[in-house]
Amino acid sequence: MTNPSAGTLTIERKQSHVELCLHANVAFSGKTTGFERFYFEHNALPEIAFAEIDCSTTFLGRHIGAPLMVSSMTGGYSEASTLNRQLAEAAEHFQIPLGVGSMRQTLESPLHRESFAVTRKYAPTTLLFANIGAPEVAQGLSQSDVAMMLDLLRADGLIVHLNAAQELFQPEGNTNFHRVLEEIHNLCATTNVPIIVKEVGNGIGAAVAEQLMEAGVQALDVAGAGGISWQKVEEYRFLQQFGHEHRFSSNALDELLNWGIPTTNCLLDIAELKRLQPQFQQIEIIASGGVSSGMDVAKSLAMGAQLAASARHLLHALHAGTLTATIEQWLNDLKAAMFLTGAATVDALRTKSLLNH
């Protein structure tokens, strides 16, 4: 499935994505994650010691150091090797899961495959996930394609990202989303590692979640609205290439750039779906999309998530040289919420009440 010219275009796009996420205003505006609308009921008698709080938990049957995941970011170009090495080192240090960026480029060309493989070298024992996009899945991945991606990382699972809004705005985007669900079902049936399906910042609602659960996925990452808008990232790229926006009316553009379901809406709706349909209880939920602190992580757990994930905030911390310190702060945020609700363990925190402002 290699195509060297397509691989070169993908490399250039990946470099541009990282630069824009670091330096451009690509966050949602006028729409938030919704985390700020909720607060924990304070427990004036926690009856636990802060020093004894245990943040460890499980994900897909594996023990992890904390309910936090380094979300899919990048790979597939030379500079990505350094970024992924540093992310992998942090994930290994804290024993938290790590997802790599889209591996489409590895299907198009063998160039820069090492930028993905480096993650397992520096994260030899923690959970590590390969990643491919819905447009590639829709075309029908061969078993050799899937095996190559998994073997390159010695991956513990495969993430399929749903990015319809991003593809719509991307100058070279692929907007043919026929057969995505069918091919996800095929992947679940033929792949011997867990399949995780995630959005990229527009959210997964209950109806789509039900379809994906029925297809056989083992985890869903809601990746709701309120964090990074990939429409805005691609709009920047479009304007750089063409100078002005002629595809959409000015009256609709702002709504399209901020299109999506807020993260907390996704979490609460899917929690209700799982409550009403017990056959889905074992499917684990990842909260992402604007997660910006350990308090957001704590609230996510109380809303039914197994863990939370972050990409852009951790990328900024990595760029600033503060990745380890930032994760440590987030874990202290989480422990503070646990202490003040009387939850000595992550499972205990899941039972605590959230109140709505």
From Swiss-Prot:
Broad EC category: isomerase
Keyword Aminoacyl-tRNA synthetase attributed: no
Short name of any one Pfam family annotated for the protein: FMN_dh
Residues annotated as binding substrate: 13-14, 102-104, 166
Chief place of localization: cytoplasm
Keywords: Cytoplasm, Flavoprotein, FMN, Isomerase, Isoprene biosynthesis, Magnesium, Metal-binding, NADP
Positions bound to Mg(2+): 167
Keyword Cytoplasm: yes
Highest rank taxon of the organism: Bacteria
Enzyme nomenclature, EC number: 5.3.3.2
Residues binding FMN, per UniProt: 71-74, 102, 131, 198, 311-312
Subunit structure: Homooctamer. Dimer of tetramers.
Protein name per its UniProtKB record: Isopentenyl-diphosphate delta-isomerase
Taxonomic source organism: Chlorobium chlorochromatii (strain CaD3)
